[in-house]
Swiss-Prot record:
Binds 1 Mg(2+) ion per subunit. This is 2-hydroxyacyl-CoA lyase 1. The keyword Lyase applies. InterPro entries: DHS-like_NAD/FAD-binding_dom, HACL1-like, THDP-binding, Thiamin_PyroP_enz_cen_dom, Thiamin_PyroP_enz_TPP-bd_dom, TPP_enzyme_TPP-bd. Pathway: Lipid metabolism; fatty acid metabolism. SUPFAM superfamilies: DHS-like NAD/FAD-binding domain, Thiamin diphosphate-binding fold (THDP-binding). Its EC number is 4.1.2.63. Changing S456R: Does not affect subcellular localization. Abolishes lyase activity. Does not affect subcellular localization, abolishes lyase activity, does not affect oligomerisation and does not bind TTP. Residues 401-486 are annotated as: Thiamine pyrophosphate binding. The gene is HACL1. One of its GO terms (biological process) is protein targeting to peroxisome.
Amino acid sequence: MPDSNFAERSEEQVSGAKVIAQALKTQDVEYIFGIVGIPVTEIAIAAQQLGIKYIGMRNEQAACYAASAIGYLTSRPGVCLVVSGPGLIHALGGMANANMNCWPLLVIGGSSERNQETMGAFQEFPQVEACRLYTKFSARPSSIEAIPFVIEKAVRSSIYGRPGACYVDIPADFVNLQVNVNSIKYMERCMSPPISMAETSAVCTAASVIRNAKQPLLIIGKGAAYAHAEESIKKLVEQYKLPFLPTPMGKGVVPDNHPYCVGAARSRALQFADVIVLFGARLNWILHFGLPPRYQPDVKFIQVDICAEELGNNVKPAVTLLGNIHAVTKQLLEELDKTPWQYPPESKWWKTLREKMKSNEAASKELASKKSLPMNYYTVFYHVQEQLPRDCFVVSEGANTMDIGRTVLQNYLPRHRLDAGTFGTMGVGLGFAIAAAVVAKDRSPGQWIICVEGDSAFGFSGMEVETICRYNLPIILLVVNNNGIYQGFDTDTWKEMLKFQDATAVVPPMCLLPNSHYEQVMTAFGGKGYFVQTPEELQKSLRQSLADTTKPSLINIMIEPQATRKAQDFHWLTRSNM
């Protein structure tokens, strides 16, 4: 009898699709986002049969953005499943975005059959080669038996070192090809990345530099959020009374309403700090490269980062601390604890920062309190902030919508803000919101995702509203509508303009159709839609949306087409003639 059972087992067959699904399951993949078709449909079905959640999107780009956000939120890669050729090409933007943001992502793409290569096969394209520019690892398994090995390596590569995107190419003939089940050897779940620590001597030097600082500043980046360093960084801030500034996605590592947060005096803090400690924040365009006039010429930078190649970029640091940000921060705490010390909370530096914060907050409050209609950005965000649940996710994209919203909308929890990020990518918002929503439903039921979109940004992925309604996700979309990119025109000006020439000759490139009813996209799919023009309408619609947990909502918020942000001490990027 045992011999008979063995013979029976050895003849059992398994398809390539099921091998792929089981390999993903073994690596703790929880979510797949994608658009099915030839040749990947069977992979999605096999994954669902194993308990992996599949979220069907309306565009591969949005699917890839969503999968990458899963990597940031869970520290294990989300999977983006795409068809061959154009489907894979549509996902390249999401792969590049994940790499730029240092988020783990695994893209699985179908490809043409091996025996048709170079013959002009259906959607034939050099996919492995194309993806190498946008990934840490790009490969095609040599056989079905090699699939578990390649998938494990891709998952491991995506989370080890600096996280990033990886690609696995699956030939169409692999998907339904049957092999002996005993020929498949599944790899064990790859371990979480090893925790590395900084050199002891460098930690001692860093502690000394911090103690001797006259005007210190901590900058908390999204790398600190990804490293789950909130506990150690908050302790460092509170124990030593140090002012801190979060980068956009570093918001919430220490709550924005913390008394030592100097976000409202950002420019002043950067310009006059003499010692700056960077926790997972890169000296790229977001932090103005660390160069004058945004910084003092002799400012001392202490860089804390997981990636050695990042250390010393653009500016020579005083100290570099290479390692896991949470572990390195604990090392700093231990070293600082050896000699009792505290930065004086009544110092001249603290006084300067508090005065500037008070001045900037007053200017923003004055703009928010304006009663004139249409509303401006500050009025909108002031009323939104009043009702935001403290535990909600805030997803944001747009130009002024994102930049102004970042200064008004508060984050109190780490990894609860997602935006255009390092790559400044427009179109990420709805994909990110969908990813946050599926994670919230599984891990923190009852949490809302508030997705704040400029009207132009909404257009990139607006059809994902159907995805939101299909899965009935806890998302409230706020479309801040100024009829354009940066600025637009009102209806009367628009009509007057069209009297003279064809729209292609007279409509400015940044203008969109005025008073577009984006809320009707949501109602078309069964969600709730609101068109609001006054603070009272905004308050009421947001209150109703938050109270109704059975449906997603879209609130279309009309603002002054020429509205802009308050005057800045420095131009954000480059000067513009607009």
